[in-house]
A protein has these predicted regions:
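Catalytic cores of DNA base-excision repair glycosylases
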Residues: 2-215
Length: 215
C-alpha cells in the first residue's frame, strides 16, 4: 500500500508543504457544522466557487436540520440546481435533515460511524466535518489528494479508503487534517492532472513520479 516513503521523508514533505501553504483553509464557506455538511454534499462534482455562490442564500433560508427535513423538494432543487445533480443532492439534503432530527437531535454527529449513516455522506465528507468542525484528526482523500499521493509514492492504490489508511500510517496523527488539506491544495494548484507545474514544485526532489517534467 505504501511504496517506500520513510518517516524522514514524511517530515521533509510536511516541512515543504508548510512553506508552500502555511495557512490551508477549506475553500467552502460555512459558519457551522451543518453549513459545512451541506456545502460539502453540494460540492460533489461541482467547484467550490460555484457552491459558494449558492450557499449564502441557501443558508439564510435553511438554518436548522429541521428546515432541510421539511423542505419542499421542488423548491430546494431549484435553489441548488446550478451545483449539478440537483435532484439527488436535494433528496440527500432532505433525508439528511430528517436523520439528523430523528437520530441526533438536529445536531451534526461527531464520529465517523455516525456521520457515514447520513444520506449523501461518505468518508471524505465525514473527514471534512471531523477535522474542520470538531478537531478530530482526519485525512480527507479527494481526487487531488489521490493524485498527489500516488505520484509521491505515498500510496500505490486507487481505493480512497486505502489511500486514507496509507496516509494515516506515514503522517503523524497531529498533521492528518492540515497535511491532507495541504496535499489537496498542492494537487489543485501545482500537481495538476494535466499540465502539472513541476518546474514550480517545492516537492520536486521528493517526487519519484516517472511522468514528472524537468525542473
Amino acid at each position: 500500500m505504501i511504496t517506500g516513503f520513510s518517516v524522514d521523508m514524511a517530515s521533509r514533505l510536511l516541512k515543504l508543504l508548510n512553506e508552500e501553504i502555511p495557512n490551508p483553509k477549506v475553500a467552502l464557506h460555512s459558519a457551522t457544522p451543518l453549513q459545512l455538511l451541506v456545502a460539502t454534499i453540494l460540492s460533489a462534482q461541482c467547484t467550490d466557487a460555484r457552491v459558494n455562490q449558492v450557499t449564502p442564500g441557501l443558508f439564510a433560508r435553511y438554518r436548522t436540520a429541521q428546515d432541510y427535513a421539511s423542505a419542499d423538494p421542488a423548491v430546494l432543487e431549484k435553489e441548488i440546481r446550478s451545483t449539478g445533480f440537483y435532484k439527488a443532492k436535494a433528496r440527500n439534503l432532505i433525508r439528511c435533515g430528517q436523520v439528523l432530527v430523528s437520530r441526533f437531535e438536529g445536531q451534526v454527529p461527531r464520529t465517523m460511524d455516525d456521520l457515514i449513516t447520513l444520506p449523501g455522506v461518505g468518508r471524505k465528507t465525514a473527514n471534512v466535518i471531523l477535522g474542520n468542525c470538531f478537531g478530530v484528526p482526519a485525512v480527507v482523500v479527494d481526487t487531488h489528494v489521490k493524485r498527489v499521493a500516488q505520484r509521491l509514492g505515498l500510496a500505490d492504490t486507487d481505493d480512497p479508503e486505502k489511500i486514507e489508511i496509507a496516509l494515516q500510517r506515514v503522517l503523524p496523527k497531529a498533521s492528518w487534517t492540515r497535511g491532507s488539506h495541504q496535499l489537496l491544495l498542492h494537487g489543485r494548484h501545482v500537481c495538476r492532472a494535466r499540465a502539472p507545474q513541476c518546474q514550480a514544485c517545492r516537492l520536486y526532489a521528493l517526487c519519484p513520479w516517472e511522468g514528472k517534467r524537468p525542473a
